[in-house]
Amino acid sequence: MTAPNPSSLVAPIRVPAGTTAGTAVREAGLPGKGEDAIVVVRVDGALKDLSWTPESDTEVEPVAANTEDGRSVIRHSAAHVLAQAVQELFPQAKLGIGPPITDGFYYDFGIDHAFTPEDLTALEKKMKQIIKEGQRFSRRVYESVEEAQAELANEPFKLELVSDKSGADDPEVMEVGGDELSAYDNLNPRTGEREWFDLCRGPHIPTTKHIPAFRLTRSSAAYWRGNQANASMQRVYGTAWESQEALDKHLELLEEAQRRDHRKLGVELDLFSFPDEIGSGLPVFHPKGGIVRKELEDYSRAKHTAAGYEFVNTPHITKENLYQTSGHLDWYSDGMFPPMHIDAELNEDGTVRKPGQNYYLKPMNCPMHHLIYRARGRSYRELPLRLFEFGSVYRYEKSGVVHGLTRVRGMTQDDAHIYTTREQMHEELTSLLRFVLDLLSDYGLDDFYLELSTKDEAKFVGSDEVWEEATKTLEQVALDSGLQLVPDPGGAAFYGPKISVQAKDALGRSWQMSTIQLDFNMPERFNLEYTAADGTRKQPVLIHRALFGSIERFFGVLTEHYAGAFPAWLSPVQAVGIPIADAHAPYLNDIVSQLKAQGIRAEVDSSDDRMNKKIVNHTNQRVPFLLLAGDRDVEAGAVSFRFRDRTQVNGVPRDEAVAAIVDWVNRRENVSPTAELLKLGASD
């Protein structure tokens, strides 16, 4: 599977001068209804309404509703309909912003009232009325900023966007951007009178009837422009699709995603928690979660050792000047925790005898790794030098964006920094990408595409020439992999471009996993050198790489990917013996002892629960192997297997049972064992 293609799947057509794009679409015989209806056109990379009229003959790409771009436009238009419904039912509400987002949309409102589920039901009803009316989306351009300000005098949040054009470069601000200030009127299809309007740069679908299926999903509190220092707002989320069938499939996916939510499973399976006493975004792993985490780390550690990485360890805090040298304090200070001022010495009268220093919790490991590299002279014979650490870092995330294990404030990165020569650079990047993809596949994630994040023109260090060389090198390595490469303009860190490995989970959702960043700037800032073969001193090229992203995030993704039913080799408890009666417990204890002797995490349930209750309990805990024993099993020297899918195999000789479990775990299979897969009683 590849990344979603946002572009049109329809062949280009020509729009004659003075003719609307919609007319050209109809004359070309392209559909105007259904899930493949043309909703907008693309002109030189920009999306335009079907009412757009070119001044000269122009070739355009028709964009269908069932493409990513088509859905995005439908969702943006649905956000407008939502805002119209809110202002009809809650006239006091002031408009914020309402962008399309992945699989949906939202709109922020300045209102003291917190929307209830009953409110969402009423809003959906009102939206359906507006959609049924078929109101036309009509674009008009303001002749001046003053004209826009006059019309929006009662909309303070819109006025802010108009007055300073803030958000012109923000993809979530659809109100302003480009060379014009424009608004969209919702027009009554019979009278042509305006029913409602909103500041917006567009584009939009032709009429509200082009929103075939939608649902409001939830509401929450928010801050204007996501800044806690700004006004508090109420946000309503929704989703919209090109057909009822597509919406139904998405809602089913949402229900399954809720069942797989790692925050919910973390509690049910006793894996981790977020105690209030510790703080937001700071998880603690319980014994069972600790086992899963250790298995993740141990396997990764072994693979890194085999690949020639050298393990290092660095402290959690450092002096301020280290991050001044690296540039983090200039470019990343918003993501860092406040400094700790320590080591000051005072005289008895309170005057300073020795000034203190600022220390920071480290947000990244790389500066400390550079100091390890620089601790002694380096030769070209040592390169590539691959330094690796499971390093704890701390990043200040706003409380509103902290989310379970996937967005935390304290995390452990499987962080590597590779120092190589320019001549080795391409080969090292190629082998590194292969290593990353292979290791992720070993954990059961094997559906990938790549993103190439390039320079943010407002936030970078180094010369344009260096950035261009680094970007071209990464692009070539990515293309050589054969995976789809999706551009991410302006998405790079301040010190270099990066490749991001995007992995799809069992529900088809994309997660950013590994990042590979090429950096020519940091070696210069830290004066990193090596002695070349000709005796001259040269600077190495630096490759930053985090394979999991963070252990916490990877743990959360795998929990949802497997719905808590981890592969047997990762499962906290791999086998549980369930005696039919108390008298059978000693027999199962012997079998469990055999399993433990071969490294299997096994136990016997000797609780007072009835056998059926024990089976239900351990099935709900996603234990991959349940071993049942009664009188016949004891007499025959056998056990009965019970699997996660509730199938059962009876009368398996105990030695064969032990061997089958040990073999399955050691083979690191990433699917749940079943009677069919285990092939009990069958020879190889």
From Swiss-Prot:
GO terms for cellular component: cytoplasm. GO terms for biological process: threonyl-tRNA aminoacylation. InterPro entries: aa-tRNA-synt_IIb, aa-tRNA-synth_II, aa-tRNA-synth_II/BPL/LPL, Anticodon-bd, Anticodon-bd_dom_sf, TGS, Thr-tRNA-ligase_IIa, Thr/Ala-tRNA-synth_IIc_edit. It comes from the Bacteria. Its EC number is 6.1.1.3. Its main location: cytoplasm. It holds the Pfam family tRNA_SAD. One of its GO terms (molecular function) is metal ion binding. Its cofactor is Zn(2+). It is an enzyme of class 6 (ligase). HAMAP family: Thr_tRNA_synth. Belongs to the class-II aminoacyl-tRNA synthetase family. This is Threonine--tRNA ligase. It comes from Mycobacteroides abscessus (strain ATCC 19977 / DSM 44196 / CCUG 20993 / CIP 104536 / JCM 13569 / NCTC 13031 / TMC 1543 / L948) (Mycobacterium abscessus).
